[in-house]
Amino acid sequence: MIIAAHRGFAARAPENTMAAFRQAAEFGCLWIETDVQLSADGVPVLIHDETVNRTTNGSGKVTDLTLRELRALDAGLWAGEVYRGEKIPLLTDLLALAEEFGLHLNLELKTELTDSDHAIAQLCEATAAVLEMQNFPADRILFSGFDTRTLHHMHKWMPHIRRGQLWEKIPPQPLALLQEIDAFSVHCDWLFLREDTAKSLRKAGYQVFCYTPNYPELVAHYADWGVGMLITDNPAIYRDENRFS
């Protein structure tokens, strides 16, 4: 199984910062998962929450703050003095690191935070524009999201890039929706994955990925179920268990 770094090496550095991404890359992770949102002036930035409150020294909704306002915040100090001065990264920052280390990126598009179809289209279009401008290899990108509308948009904007449908718990009959968005993979909370579901999805041709299994002994059997990727806050525990790849 592939071991991917969830929001970077989030167990060792503040999540979704360049420190966390670089630590994951230097540790040897080939895949990094992160979250993409738009600043108020339309720039793709990497942050998970709807607001900056939890992970910075500021407050307010991400989409209400300009890039200049977002970059003025400290995104590292909450995790310790050593990370003082870490900024909310741009998507372009992570792409540069990915080029340096040959990384693959799982870009979760955070559009479930809005009901606006226009806002969803804006995020998808802006993300596509950055990837095209940077000429980043399509085979090293995976788009993912809980909001199926987003994956429809990315199918339109960049049909050559793979798409993964995120669920907490996979619904009883997922195949029609997966076919509709031409999905490559299904991502779910490891706690709710069932053996029969995993095997039926693999039989139907879909990859099965799980987030965030931080206890290797509890998912050791997932490889037998056909699970291809574990997205964890702490990749080191899988190296310790000789399950790192």
Describe these PLM feature segments:
Residues 1-245:
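Phosphate-group recognition and catalysis centered on beta-loop-alpha active-site segments
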